[in-house]
């Protein structure tokens, strides 16, 4: 693991994926106590836990942790059907961003055709919608966010 300062400019997508992977592997998200390596008089390294009595001199310093690409290939246990960390850029933007494209807003221009069977690797929504009939629901939330009553029976015609 290497640390660099934040003054290197903007981060690439690969370095951000590496950073997320490293956080998961290092257990930083579990609030583990960081360790420091100290040298003894005979030159041997020992690992010392950092205590609150030792204030960090670099209070404003936030390191960026980068991981070798080989480490990404070795660790497959963090794979998820919803999130894919990859070194390669996706073939097209995620579906949520298609409405922001100027091509979609201008309906007079021709749409680009794509070949069948293209890969959608890495393009999963965070929360997949579920379409199914619900029969035991008495109240619901409409598209404006208001609580509404669900009718159990709809009468048609004159009453």
From Swiss-Prot:
PROSITE patterns for the chain: NGF_2
Pro-peptide positions on chain: 4-113
Secreted is among the record's keywords: yes
Key words, A-Z: Cleavage on pair of basic residues, Glycoprotein, Growth factor, Secreted, Signal
Name of encoding gene: NTF3
Signal peptide annotation: 1-3
PANTHER family attached to this UniProt entry: NERVE GROWTH FACTOR NGF -RELATED, NEUROTROPHIN-3
Cell compartments where the protein resides: Secreted
Pfam families: NGF, NTF3_N
Record-linked InterPro entries: Cystine-knot_cytokine (IPR029034), Nerve_growth_factor-like (IPR020408), Nerve_growth_factor-rel (IPR002072), Neurotrophin-3 (IPR015578), NTF3_N (IPR045815)
SUPFAM superfamilies for this protein: Cystine-knot cytokines (SSF57501)
Function comment: Seems to promote the survival of visceral and proprioceptive sensory neurons.
Keyword Secreted: yes
One GO MF term: nerve growth factor receptor binding
GO BP annotations listed: cell surface receptor protein tyrosine kinase signaling pathway; modulation of chemical synaptic transmission; negative regulation of neuron apoptotic process; nerve development; nerve growth factor signaling pathway; neuron projection morphogenesis
The protein's name in its UniProt record: Neurotrophin-3
Sites where a glycan is attached: 106
Organism (species): Loxocemus bicolor
Source lineage: Eukaryota, Metazoa, Chordata, Craniata, Vertebrata
